[in-house]
């Protein structure tokens, strides 16, 4: 595989990840969001090079998370230009996490080839998501692949059984099987057919369960939740003369929310 092909797959992985999440609404991307990573891992398995696996994984995480988290700089730049440094540190760390995942998955394929990638990848990548969600001040617990399917409510209803992590494992499993089906369609039609059928069957089952839940689940009002956002400027927050005005504004808005309930 040439460097250009690796760069293309890394870039494609970043684009798929970006468009899989809101505000974009392309649910089908959630099922192939890790396809570029799967293609890279298949190549790494054939090479048996764990050092190269970490390198490719680092670039994959660095670029993809750099694209997805672009808003960090946009949102925080007016507070301090140091937000650019924080953004860089964050995506470098994400690259290290992803590099570790590529290294481990390649190592597992080398030492335990009888365990298929559609088993190891969902488990290891979900561990990565858990680590990213518990990374201190730069934690992103909402960045799981399962959260990308929220634009297809009928397909995520079974999260009441497996949670967002369960949805994520399913989507990762689909990515692996779809890539393997595409690779085996020439010469191994039966193998490709059962992989494609397995994905379609799980989507159909998810749809059926979701449709049932959405039509039979009884809803009742439990209360009113109000969000108060006074839009106080960054520099105003540190001005002692503005303290009382800010408190009065918060109290006024809170009373308005309470009156609405």
Name each model-derived stretch:
Residues 210-261:
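Soluble catalytic regions of membrane-associated enzymes that act on cell-envelope
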Residues 1-216, 247-251, 255:
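Membrane-embedded alpha-helical bundles of multi-pass enzymes
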